[in-house]
Design a protein with these regions (language model features):
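Actinobacteria-biased recognition of intrinsically disordered, low-complexity terminal regions
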Residues: 1-20
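Regulatory input/activation interfaces that engage signals or partners
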Residues: 12, 16-18, 25-171, 176, ...
Length: 197
């Protein structure tokens, strides 16, 4: 049975980058395939990598009523050696503490309330990522110090998010390098519940 999903706003015709238009179309197409979440996330990340350098992606599910995490998929962090089974729980505790127990920047709840629910850690901290507790006890020690977060919002409800990481060797995310941001609404619509396996 097919359930219609909320339709995202297609990118503005004046958008200067043809690759973004192509990316939006690809994400919309993926959204019609009813793929399991893990496979869909991998497919979207693979397409984003065609226009954006990403060393690791970590997708999360959020409860739209309270914005608490319901799932995490750190498979790329583990596969690329940034996390191990022994350090995964400590990293998860650090991320959760920054979301709900201590002040930090670019929390999922804060991003969900923005017009564009996406932010780069170094931009928010004005070039001083050490202002972030999450950076000090997770990102810097683990090895992918550069972070860009995006919350998936559909019909004003935040139900998921993705964190993109870069190593020091890859360089930081910048406004210029993150120009696929206009595709985020389409990512939200393509991956939104309720019929995803």
């Amino acid at each position: 049975m097919r359930v219609d999903r909320p339709r995202a706003v297609v990118s503005d015709p004046a958008m200067p980058h043809d690759p973004v238009r192509h990316l939006v179309a690809e994400v919309e197409r993926l959204g019609t395939r009813a793929l399991p979440y893990a496979e869909l996330h991998r497919e979207i990340t693979d397409r984003l990598r065609q226009v954006l350098r990403i060393d690791a992606a970590c997708w999360h599910g959020l409860d739209p009523d309270n914005r608490l995490p319901t799932t995490a998929n750190p498979v790329e962090l583990l596969a690329n050696g940034f996390l191990t089974p022994q350090t995964e729980m400590a990293a998860a505790r650090s991320v959760l503490a920054s979301e709900y127990q201590r002040p930090d920047v670019n929390t999922f709840a804060a991003l969900a309330g923005r017009r564009l629910p996406s932010a780069i850690l170094s931009e928010t901290t004005r070039g001083r990522p050490e202002r972030s507790a999450r950076y000090n006890d997770f990102l810097a020690p683990v090895g992918p110090p550069h972070e860009m977060r995006t919350v998936m919002v559909t019909l004003e409800r935040a139900w998921g998010c993705v964190v993109f990481h870069r190593t020091a060797a890859s360089g930081d995310f910048t406004t210029e390098s993150s120009w696929p941001r206009p595709a985020w609404p389409n990512c939200s619509a393509a991956t939104s519940p309720p019929t995803r396996p």
